[in-house]
Swiss-Prot record:
Transmembrane region(s): 5-25
Gene knockout outcome: Does not affect tolerance to 2-benzoxazolinone (BOA).
Family statement drawn from the similarity comment of this UniProt entry: Belongs to the 3-hydroxyacyl-CoA dehydrogenase family.
Residues at the catalytic site: 151 (for hydroxyacyl-coenzyme a dehydrogenase activity)
GO cellular component assignments: membrane
Protein name: 3-hydroxyacyl-CoA dehydrogenase FVEG_12628
Signal sequence interval, chain numbering: none
Keywords: Membrane, Oxidoreductase, Transmembrane, Transmembrane helix
Membrane topology, record value: Single-pass membrane protein
Lineage, top ranks: Eukaryota, Fungi, Dikarya, Ascomycota, Pezizomycotina
Miscellaneous field: Fusarium verticillioides possesses 2 unlinked loci, FDB1 and FDB2, necessary for detoxification of antimicrobial compounds produced by maize, including 2-benzoxazolinone (BOA). The FDB2 cluster arose as a duplication of the FDB1 cluster with rearrangement and expansion by incorporating additional genes.
Presence of the UniProt keyword Membrane in the record: yes
Any single GO BP term: fatty acid metabolic process
Length: 322
């Protein structure tokens, strides 16, 4: 598809769908959005109000949010969409039927991007009768309007034109897309999170560290560096910089890391009732007094400040800005 994308259909407006709506509206796009859940439309309006300060950073709030329609029959409106962002439940049979419906009613060539967080699109295109080559994964991180990352994951039959359309579109709305060259369950970032979380659960449930100190070990340590340069560049910097620095780091720390890996695998979190109970007990102590509304508000504020600071640095800015 070569035409400009001006209208996006959002199918499913849970937290992810609502975040996409805020992002697309902030960029002046028209949004047609639908969700069968009772109360979904009111929830969407409330989410827009919560995101008022973000939207006001891009223009007049009332003007921006007037550019969407909540509809109950999305199929009858799909022909108007230049791109479709699907956010249905992570249930395979449901996803297959939904994607087939989107494929049936979408205009030829219109990309159908799924926000699936772990199911590869090759698993839910079987019922597509029109054109499965335009289906791919466009997986965001929550909240989509704040965190730039989106993982673009084509299935083996996805056309290169559809991939390029998705990549260019996400860049145009301020996202930082990454392209996966092969499908893997969970994609990239969720696999990284799973590896870190599983080790975190193991350390906490074994009584080695509290949940509170585990979070501090990330937020006051490597998490700060990873947010700026990522694990690979951080390793290279630790070895003096450049590809040679990465190689030196691997040679110097490789034997020790392999030893840690043996211990990590030996004590990996087994999801047993005993381990789960110990983990939950520490989490209760750590998080019981947290004021969650305040935490979310402050998190989003600092996140925006961090993104703005990174954007000013040539080596850390996103290609299209955010």
């Amino acid at each position: 598809m070569t035409q400009e994308i001006r209208t996006v259909a959002i199918v499913g407006c849970g937290v992810i769908g609502m975040g996409w709506a805020v992002l697309f509206l902030s960029r002046g796009l028209k949004v047609i959005i639908s969700d069968p859940m009772e109360g979904a439309e009111n929830a969407l309006k409330g989410y827009f109000e919560q995101s008022r300060s973000y939207l006001e950073g891009f223009g007049d709030y009332d003007k921006l949010v007037s550019n969407y329609e909540f509809v109950h029959d999305i199929a009858s409106r799909l022909a108007e969409a230049d791109l479709i962002q699907e956010n249905g439940p992570e249930r395979l049979e449901f996803k297959r039927g939904l994607i087939a419906t989107l494929d049936k009613y979408a205009r030829p060539g219109v990309v159908i991007a799924s926000s699936s967080s772990g199911l590869p699109s090759s698993e839910f295109i079987q019922q597509c009768k029109q054109d499965s080559t335009r289906v791919l994964i466009g997986h965001p991180f929550n909240p989509p309007h704040l965190i730039p990352l989106v993982e673009v994951v084509p299935h083996p039959g996805t056309s290169s034109e559809s991939v390029n359309t998705a990549l260019n579109f996400y860049r145009s709305v301020g996202k930082r897309p990454i392209l996966l060259h092969h499908e893997v369950p969970g994609f990239v970032s969720n696999r990284l999170q799973a590896a870190i979380n599983n080790e975190a659960y193991s350390l906490i449930s074994r009584g080695i560290v509290s949940a509170e100190d585990l979070d501090a070990a990330v937020t006051s340590g490597p998490g700060l560096r990873w947010a700026l340069t990522g694990p690979i560049a951080t390793n290279a910097l630790g070895g003096g910089g450049g590809p040679e620095g990465f190689s030196q780091r691997m040679e110097r720390l490789g034997p020790a890391i392999r030893g840690w890996e043996d211990d990590i695998l030996k004590h990996r979190f087994d999801w047993s009732e005993q381990r789960m109970s110990a983990l939950q007990e520490s989490v209760n102590k750590s998080l019981g007094a947290v004021k969650w509304d305040q935490l979310v508000e402050e998190r989003d504020l600092v996140l925006l400040q961090l993104l703005a600071a990174k954007q000013k640095m040539a080596s850390m800015s996103t290609p299209s800005g955010h």
